[in-house]
Regions:
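Short, basic, low-complexity termini and linkers enriched in Ser/Thr/Gly/Pro
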Residues: 1-2, 212-236
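Nucleotide and nucleotide-moiety/phosphate-recognizing core
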Residues: 2-189, 200-211
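Conserved active-site and cofactor/substrate-binding residues in soluble primary-metabolism enzymes
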Residues: 197
């Protein structure tokens, strides 16, 4: 699989996870925290992976992290700025022209699909390359040019909170299902994990996928067929 040395990877650690009741990034997924699983998925294909979240929280996992200084604490007077602030922080910190930005709660992402998305983005004239599903756009599994940072920071300063509203000012190249599903047809690919039921479903899927992979590895190969010896010996 190709490594895109001109692309930086960022994982948005997420907010308070009020519906989950726990930090989604630290939930066990296949024996490791979900955010570490996601980092390992990105590491082989990008120049480096950075978490946008609390540096002290993720340092113990060996992950580089930057604080999202633009995020305000939740409250009636200062509502949280959500993932838009995380995207702004990533694009402010980056030195790479292209940046793969994903949320930490997308357990079904595949390396094959991310590799394809990056290849697709590097040939695009858009400022952001964003997949779309039947539910709408998926800006938290997308590729952004560094120059998008200024427009997104400006949107934050004006009080914009929805990512979908902020990117209206960008030149967006939408990737429709008919295109990306040729690479990864799974309906689960871009499904995020918000509630305990979603987490249980993702864990079951992960366990089944690992079991299937192990069975494939352990499956014995058929013994090679022996050549039949001729019943008639050559006469001297």
């Amino acid at each position: 699989m190709k490594r895109y040395s001109q692309v930086a990877g960022f994982i948005l650690a997420g907010g308070a996870s009020s519906r989950m009741g726990r930090d989604k990034g630290l939930l066990d997924f296949g024996g490791v925290p979900l955010i570490l699983h996601t980092a390992r998925l990105l590491e082989p294909i990008v120049a480096g992976v950075t978490i946008v979240g609390s540096p002290s929280k993720y340092a113990k996992l060996g992950l580089r992290a930057i604080a999202d200084d633009a995020r305000a604490p939740d409250g009636p007077d200062r509502p949280g700025r959500g993932p838009l602030a995380g995207i702004a922080a990533a694009l402010t910190a980056t030195h790479s022209r292209w940046n793969l930005i994903v949320a930490c709660d997308l357990p079904y992402l595949s390396a094959k699909w991310l590799d394809w998305l990056l290849s697709r983005a590097l040939g695009s004239r858009g400022e952001a390359v964003i997949p779309r599903t039947e539910r709408g756009i998926e800006p938290l599994a997308a590729v952004y040019r560094r120059e998008c940072g200024a427009a997104i920071a400006d949107a934050l300063a004006r009080g914009v909170r929805k990512v979908s509203d902020a990117i209206e000012e960008l030149r967006v190249d939408l990737v429709y299902p008919r295109e990306w599903r040729q690479i990864e047809p799974s309906e689960l690919l871009l499904k995020n994990m918000n509630a305990p039921g979603d987490y249980e479903e993702a864990r079951n899927w992960c366990a089944a996928a690992r079991l299937s992979a192990n069975d494939h590895v352990r499956k014995p190969r058929p013994a090679p067929k022996r050549k039949r010896q001729s019943a008639v010996r050559r006469r001297k």
